Regions:
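Glycine-rich beta-alpha junction loops
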Residues: 15, 38-43
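Conserved thiamine diphosphate
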Residues: 1-25
Length: 133
């Protein structure tokens, strides 16, 4: 996005209609295009494969993974968060983050991760104010 290429987008496996829309859109744009897709790895992340779609939804709803489109370096659209969740809801189901929630939870680390999510929410204006009220 920093290079101002014609089209950049992010997507998750939780919303295949959004992903399809972005792929079709990218096909019709001249020049460089880039789509980053959040795809969970059940084996590597230590979660049941049937939770893959849910983890994709949780990362978006936590704000850790903003889902957006940008043209020539300018954000033109975002997929709003309907129900903001704490990052713990995304992190806890994954065995790769178990060390954060042991006998002595790493509260400071979790708070830093939450701060990143909150920054994304503010930067990309991700909250759907109508759905939140």
């Amino acid at each position: 996005m920093a290079h101002g290429i014609p089209y950049v987008a992010t997507a998750t496996t939780a919303d295949l209609h959004d992903l399809e829309y972005k792929v079709r859109r990218a096909i019709n744009i001249r020049g460089a295009k880039y789509i980053q897709i959040f795809v969970p790895c059940p084996l590597g992340w230590g979660l049941p494969s049937e939770q893959s779609i849910n983890i994709s939804r949780l990362v978006k709803e936590s704000g850790l993974y903003p889902v957006f489109e940008a043209e020539h370096g300018v954000v033109t659209g975002v997929l709003k968060i309907r129900r903001k969740i704490p990052v713990e809801e995304y992190l806890k189901p994954q065995r790769r983050y178990a060390h954060l929630f042991g006998k002595e939870p790493l509260v400071d680390v979790i708070a830093k991760i939450q701060a990143i999510a909150d920054h994304n929410i503010q930067k990309y204006q991700l909250l759907d104010e109508e759905a939140m009220s």
